[in-house]
């Protein structure tokens, strides 16, 4: 049985989202904005916060590919924001309301116990 993640008004298969994140070297993917606050309207986009695996070479082509694939998966327009690129003025509020959707597991050699 596959688990479903509520992404705004859409339900997304957790395994498919995880595969997509691994393909694009995503370390963490979080939901924020109206979808995270359960205030979405039919015309709302889905706000997603992304952090890439350290050292991953993510160029504009790959970033755009991730955006396109997420839009297809969700079935609506999304606004993908890099955690690194968050403006200081909104950073605290975005991080406070962010709901984690995916987190990559650290390789065994990098885990801290």
Describe these PLM feature segments.
Residues 31:
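Conserved histidines in hydrophobic membrane contexts and catalytic metal-binding motifs
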Residues 49-51:
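Short hydrophobic/aromatic beta-strand micro-patches
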């Amino acid at each position: 049985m596959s688990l479903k993640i509520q992404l705004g008004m859409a339900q997304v298969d957790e395994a498919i989202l995880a595969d997509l994140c691994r393909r694009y070297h995503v370390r963490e993917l979080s939901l924020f904005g109206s979808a995270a606050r359960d205030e979405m309207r039919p015309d709302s986009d889905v706000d997603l916060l992304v952090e890439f695996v350290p050292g991953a070479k993510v160029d504009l082509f790959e970033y755009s590919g991730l955006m396109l694939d997420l839009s297809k998966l969700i079935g609506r327009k999304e606004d993908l924001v890099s955690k690194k690129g968050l403006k200081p003025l909104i950073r605290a509020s975005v991080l406070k309301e962010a709901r984690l959707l995916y987190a990559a597991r650290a390789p065994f050699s990098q885990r801290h116990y």
